[in-house]
Amino acid sequence: MPVLVVNVDHVATLRQQRKGKEPDPLTAAHLVELAGARGIIVHLREDRRHIQDHDVELMARTLKTRLHLEMAATEEMQAIALARQPYMVCLVPEKREELTTEGGLAVAGREAFLKDYLAPIHARGILSSLFIEADEAQVRAAAAIGCPYIELHTGHFADAPTRAAQRAERDKIVRAIGLARSLGLGVNLGHGLNYDNIYEFADVPGISEFSIGHSIVARAVFTGFERAVADMAAIIARFPA
């Protein structure tokens, strides 16, 4: 069955509003672990708007579960990944003006660059993933460079204005999952998933992980992290492998 990995960036966002020490995303990460999530995600952005370098360092040293590091494909981030050695790195596009990651990484046409970029990361035994749109060309390009995983962007599905539009976006994702699996790729889903819309994937086989952050942190404000994570993990536990 698929597993839950939880993004704690929004805890760091709240901390950075006051440039203080609280709330601590490391504490949130440990609570997420205790609640049964299989991994923690942090996005170390180039502008350091939420997660900071010391957060990654502390999590890499102390977490018992998997640390997933989201990052742009820059020399600086490559060096950090090699130094901290997370379980997985996920390459994502970044724009300074965006509130959150707005779309998938352009892989098609950049295969040679990305393959070379990931080579030293793979050599250290670190898994990699590419955050991409549910698009055939992007899926095939990801497979061509030898990346073991992709994460399909579910934001268009989550933000669809009508039920029909949502179903159309879901169908694109399901087709992309099937293609990726046929090419030997592991498939993760993430962006905009919540306690309601995640059921749209309850009958879809071939998903390895669900990457969820905002909706869990939002619920945790009222229920606490352990309850919020446990509720989502219980939903996913009923999904097929």
Swiss-Prot record:
<feature type="active site" description="Proton donor">
    <location>
        <position position="191"/>
    </location>
</feature>
<dbReference type="GO" id="GO:0005829">
    <property type="term" value="C:cytosol"/>
</dbReference>
<feature type="site" description="Transition state stabilizer">
    <location>
        <position position="151"/>
    </location>
</feature>
<comment type="similarity">
    <text>Belongs to the PNP synthase family.</text>
</comment>
<feature type="binding site">
    <location>
        <position position="45"/>
    </location>
    <ligand>
        <name>1-deoxy-D-xylulose 5-phosphate</name>
    </ligand>
</feature>
<comment type="pathway">
    <text>Cofactor biosynthesis; pyridoxine 5'-phosphate biosynthesis; pyridoxine 5'-phosphate from D-erythrose 4-phosphate: step 5/5.</text>
</comment>
<feature type="binding site">
    <location>
        <position position="50"/>
    </location>
    <ligand>
        <name>1-deoxy-D-xylulose 5-phosphate</name>
    </ligand>
</feature>
<feature type="active site" description="Proton acceptor">
    <location>
        <position position="43"/>
    </location>
</feature>
<feature type="binding site">
    <location>
        <position position="18"/>
    </location>
    <ligand>
        <name>3-amino-2-oxopropyl phosphate</name>
    </ligand>
</feature>
<feature type="binding site">
    <location>
        <position position="7"/>
    </location>
    <ligand>
        <name>3-amino-2-oxopropyl phosphate</name>
    </ligand>
</feature>
<dbReference type="InterPro" id="IPR036130">
    <property type="entry name" value="Pyridoxine-5'_phos_synth"/>
</dbReference>
<keyword id="KW-0963">Cytoplasm</keyword>
<protein>
    <recommendedName>
        <fullName>Pyridoxine 5'-phosphate synthase</fullName>
        <ecNumber>2.6.99.2</ecNumber>
    </recommendedName>
</protein>
<dbReference type="InterPro" id="IPR013785">
    <property type="entry name" value="Aldolase_TIM"/>
</dbReference>
<comment type="function">
    <text>Catalyzes the complicated ring closure reaction between the two acyclic compounds 1-deoxy-D-xylulose-5-phosphate (DXP) and 3-amino-2-oxopropyl phosphate (1-amino-acetone-3-phosphate or AAP) to form pyridoxine 5'-phosphate (PNP) and inorganic phosphate.</text>
</comment>
<comment type="subunit">
    <text>Homooctamer; tetramer of dimers.</text>
</comment>
<feature type="binding site">
    <location>
        <begin position="213"/>
        <end position="214"/>
    </location>
    <ligand>
        <name>3-amino-2-oxopropyl phosphate</name>
    </ligand>
</feature>
<feature type="active site" description="Proton acceptor">
    <location>
        <position position="70"/>
    </location>
</feature>
<dbReference type="Pfam" id="PF03740">
    <property type="entry name" value="PdxJ"/>
</dbReference>
<feature type="binding site">
    <location>
        <position position="100"/>
    </location>
    <ligand>
        <name>1-deoxy-D-xylulose 5-phosphate</name>
    </ligand>
</feature>
<keyword id="KW-0664">Pyridoxine biosynthesis</keyword>
<feature type="binding site">
    <location>
        <begin position="9"/>
        <end position="10"/>
    </location>
    <ligand>
        <name>1-deoxy-D-xylulose 5-phosphate</name>
    </ligand>
</feature>
<dbReference type="InterPro" id="IPR004569">
    <property type="entry name" value="PyrdxlP_synth_PdxJ"/>
</dbReference>
<feature type="binding site">
    <location>
        <position position="192"/>
    </location>
    <ligand>
        <name>3-amino-2-oxopropyl phosphate</name>
    </ligand>
</feature>
<keyword id="KW-0808">Transferase</keyword>
<dbReference type="GO" id="GO:0008615">
    <property type="term" value="P:pyridoxine biosynthetic process"/>
</dbReference>
<dbReference type="GO" id="GO:0033856">
    <property type="term" value="F:pyridoxine 5'-phosphate synthase activity"/>
</dbReference>
